[in-house]
From Swiss-Prot:
This is Probable glucan 1,3-beta-glucosidase A. It comes from Aspergillus fumigatus (strain ATCC MYA-4609 / CBS 101355 / FGSC A1100 / Af293) (Neosartorya fumigata). GO terms for cellular component: extracellular region. The active site is at E211, E308. It is found in: Secreted. Glycans are attached at N344. Belongs to the glycosyl hydrolase 5 (cellulase A) family. The keyword Manganese applies.
Length: 416
């Protein structure tokens, strides 16, 4: 789900340079038959940590499995097929239910983005993963239909790992684009598309691949070729479905001219805790950074949705940098500078935050909402956690920190 390496600083360089030419911020895609027009505004949330596990979202699952379980691959390998299937089935059936979708709709949102791994549809030899996720994804589509929500299906993990992050299913070296991994990914994507794109009243978009890591070694030319293959698959099945394309941790405007006008939407992610400079900012600096990012994405010649972002400004959440990995904020990881204390923010509820922390979080969230709606909207990461203040929209809403209604502002015009 998230950017977890120091090369975020490289990406920041792309975002602070001025645009060489002005590009209209509301460039339109071609006329479409879809039930959602992505020239408009997306307001939604990710259903993270459900069908693709992440240690920081559900730390209890990983902590109960022992030290070796650091991602879904090692979790299932450690538990074995039978126990892993039992543990995950219990999680899938209880962590997210129809009531969550009703709450999301009642909060005023129009979209959910649902991550799914290739292993849910394409079992490969000698891999420990268990399947069974599609039954729950089927349920989610039905729940979204009843709630009046649109769905972006997000291929979140590819064979070999496209980014080396635990959210790809397997933490470690990036092996995607080696051997048959790209063709295997296309096969998995096609299986998802054939199953879900016919439900175009609800599934209005599908994402080619989450966070392929170009700064980390993924070939940009190879990624563009993969995107072309994916677009062909979608057009063969349902030409009315939009395709979300990750920017690969490059600037969105670096993709200008690529598949422009072809019903594609750029997906960019913005976090301010995985980089030593950004994590050092005070709240005024975080607000300015978010507003500046919103101005930068206006340079894209395609619709842009900020498909992941949060209210957090530190990396204090337990396991956020990886299971058992310490924090930048307290000077324990990737630097020797201490920026602050993680007291009350490692685990718990938004209610446990100080009044000032809640106020600052509200300011930061409002600034991002305004910034991202300057282009084509947003999908917050994530709906629910086991206790990660700043990341848990359900908890933020319940404690009055996430705006309700979504247009309510206690701190108006921050990006003016």
């Amino acid at each position: 789900m998230i950017f977890k390496f120091s090369q975020k600083a490289l990406v920041a360089l792309y975002l602070v340079v001025g645009l060489a030419e002005a590009v209209p911020s509301k460039s339109r895609v071609v006329s479409r038959a879809s039930t959602f027009d992505y020239n408009g505004i997306v307001r939604g949330v990710n259903i993270g940590g459900w069908l693709v596990l992440e240690p920081w979202i559900t730390p209890s699952i990983f902590d109960n499995a022992g030290d070796a379980a650091v991602d879904e691959w090692t979790l299932t390998a450690t538990l074995g097929q039978d126990q892993a299937k039992a543990v995950l089935s219990q999680h899938w059936s209880t962590f997210i239910t129809q009531d969550d979708f009703q709450q999301i709709a009642q909060a005023g949102m129009n979209h959910v983005r649902i991550p799914i791994g290739y292993w849910a549809v394409s079992s490969l030899p000698d891999e420990p993963y268990v399947d069974g996720q599609l039954e729950y994804l089927d349920n989610a589509i039905s729940w979204a239909r009843e709630a009046g929500l649109k769905v972006v299906i997000d291929l979140h993990g590819a064979p070999g790992s496209q980014n080396g992050f635990d959210n790809s299913g397997r933490k470690g070296p990036i092996a995607w684009q080696q051997g048959d991994t790209v063709s295997q990914t296309v096969d998995a994507f096609r299986a998802l598309a054939e199953r879900y794109l016919p439900q175009s009243d609800v599934v209005t978009a599908i994402e080619a691949l989450n966070e392929p890591n170009i700064p980390g070694g993924v070939s940009e030319a190879g990624l563009r070729d993969y995107y072309n293959q994916i677009a062909d698959v979608v057009r063969q099945i349902d030409p009315g479905t939009s395709v979300f394309l990750s920017d690969g941790f490059l600037s969105t405007e670096s993709w200008n001219g690529f598949k422009t006008g072809e019903d594609v939407v750029m997906d960019t992610h913005h976090y301010e805790m995985f980089d030593n400079y950004l994590i050092s900012l005070d709240i005024d600096g975080h607000v300015k950074s978010a507003c500046d990012f919103g101005k930068q994405i206006e340079g894209s010649d395609k619709p842009v949705v900020v498909g992941e972002w949060s209210g957090a400004v530190t990396d204090c959440t337990k396991h956020l940098n990886g299971k058992g990995v310490s924090t930048r904020y307290q000077g324990e990881y990737a630097n020797n500078v201490k920026y602050g204390d993680c007291a009350n923010t490692t685990q718990g509820s938004v209610a446990d935050l100080s009044d000032q922390e809640r106020t600052d979080t509200r300011r930061f969230i409002e600034a991002q909402l305004d910034a991202y709606e300057g282009k084509n909207g947003w999908l917050f990461w994530t709906w629910k956690t086991e206790g990660a203040p700043g990341w848990d929209m359900q908890d933020l809403l319940a404690n009055g920190v996430f705006p309700s209604p979504l247009t309510d502002r206690q701190f108006p015009n921050q990006c003016a």
